[in-house]
């Protein structure tokens, strides 16, 4: 008898909300030449086919920077740059066109595969390329002629939408024509960024050699706001990094984010299944650039009762929290503050004020097990403290049996029962023997 594993079942169940959320949405995927050259590229193609099969409208933009550099070296043509931008003379343009054309055919062929025993079996994907992007020359800067290096003049977004409506994947490369019939070399990041903006895409997705943006300790930064992303760009450029996949993508992501693209995701092209893990799990695997954090701290309402109960029940069963009925929670819901991530309540706390004694109780503090190693507890404490001050309270107290040291680290000090509000003293459970700790809000 075959062993039955629930891992696949659990994973599929958790991914269903994201499958439903992404269906019919438009994503622009930026594939740099480094990603295409990597041995994991066939897996990325398979995952793109998977996204298409789930009803996601896809525009794939590819670059060819390393392939162009190799071809130039083979032909003994020295690459020329001005202000970190390639100068594309006539000889270089021919190399660019050859490299980009080869990649277009290769990507189209890979997406068109329909072999048995492959992820694209029976997919029958239509891949469409065309003159959707019209270019214009960069011109002359400081006396330097960029020749056939160009920038976008306009995008025929209506034509692209028609192809997406017909369930095709739109494939766009780094070479575009002008109204005069000339060809120009564009940067893939500009093409992807402007396409995402013009198409009003929900996501811009890019790849780099690392798992995303990393901090000083080497940990992945899961989320950046545009200003934070700009700081990262400046820090990388001070080290001489102007062309890495990370820098190029972050530049585009900041622009896209500020022009209406909801989220931009930076992933590793070396990690198998990175795009699937990023898009179909709550926490993802890379770095996303967003105008507004995926997590929201807000006051709870009646619709949050189910999520709060699901969060606190395990802690009540362990005796860490005092048991609350649904009815009690409904009556006290206005006292609660929650942290919500993708419609999941991941933390909560309540504030019960005793106005006459200018003190409040912080109670029912709970954090989802997957997020306890982070700073959600501190976020809740800060929010509850702010609410207490706004109410004119001078102190906060907690009753706890397990988290004594954590609260002491945050400035709470042990106290006796006579320091509690008179009403709370009468309700104190001597069998539970909770420790009493008090925070002076004016000494934070």
Curated annotation (Swiss-Prot):
Pathway: Amino-acid biosynthesis; L-arginine biosynthesis; N(2)-acetyl-L-ornithine from L-glutamate: step 1/4. One of its GO terms (molecular function) is L-glutamate N-acetyltransferase activity. Keywords: Acyltransferase, Amino-acid biosynthesis, Arginine biosynthesis, Cytoplasm, Transferase. It comes from the Bacteria. SUPFAM superfamilies: Acyl-CoA N-acyltransferases (Nat), Carbamate kinase-like. The gene is argA. This is Amino-acid acetyltransferase. Gene3D superfamilies: 3.40.630.30, Acetylglutamate kinase-like. GO terms for biological process: L-arginine biosynthetic process. InterPro entries: AceGlu_kinase-like_sf (IPR036393), Acyl_CoA_acyltransferase (IPR016181), Asp/Glu/Uridylate_kinase (IPR001048), GNAT_dom (IPR000182), NAGS_kin (IPR033719), NH2A_AcTrfase (IPR010167). It catalyses: L-glutamate + acetyl-CoA = N-acetyl-L-glutamate + CoA + H(+).
